[in-house]
Each structure stands twice: as structure tokens, then as C-alpha cells.
Amino acid sequence: MAVQKSRKTPSRRGMRRSHDALSTTAITVDETTGELHRRHHVTADGYYKGKKVIQDK
């Protein structure tokens, strides 16, 4: 089993964790409906880049 030889300092721990932060998702307003949606994703109404891509049932 792997066991560390000496204790890691808080500085080293912080350096290791420096890339663990979550980034915010990019939100865009749809040009047709004005609805908020994630970038490169279809809106809840079925629009993508101003075109209807999912038909209503």
C-alpha cells in the first residue's frame, strides 16, 4: 500500500486543488424567443440558432 513519507503542507494541498474549481455555464438569450439557454444547446421550446429543430407533439 502506498504511504507518503512526509506530510503535505497546506500550501501543497492548495496548489493541488487550484484546478478543482467549477466554472459557470455560459448562458445566452435565444434570438427568436428571447429565452435563456445554455450555449450550443436547444432551448426548451425546441429552437436552435433561430430555427425550430424539434417539432411539438
From Swiss-Prot:
Residues 1-37 are annotated as: Disordered. Keywords: Ribonucleoprotein, Ribosomal protein. GO terms for biological process: translation. Residues 1-16 have a biased composition (Basic residues). GO terms for molecular function: structural constituent of ribosome. Residues 21-31 have a biased composition (Polar residues). GO terms for cellular component: large ribosomal subunit. InterPro entries: Ribosomal_bL32, Ribosomal_bL32_bact, Ribosomal_zn-bd. Transmembrane segments: none annotated. PANTHER family: 50S RIBOSOMAL PROTEIN L32, LARGE RIBOSOMAL SUBUNIT PROTEIN BL32. Belongs to the bacterial ribosomal protein bL32 family. HAMAP family: Ribosomal_bL32. This is Large ribosomal subunit protein bL32. It comes from Hydrogenovibrio crunogenus (strain DSM 25203 / XCL-2) (Thiomicrospira crunogena).
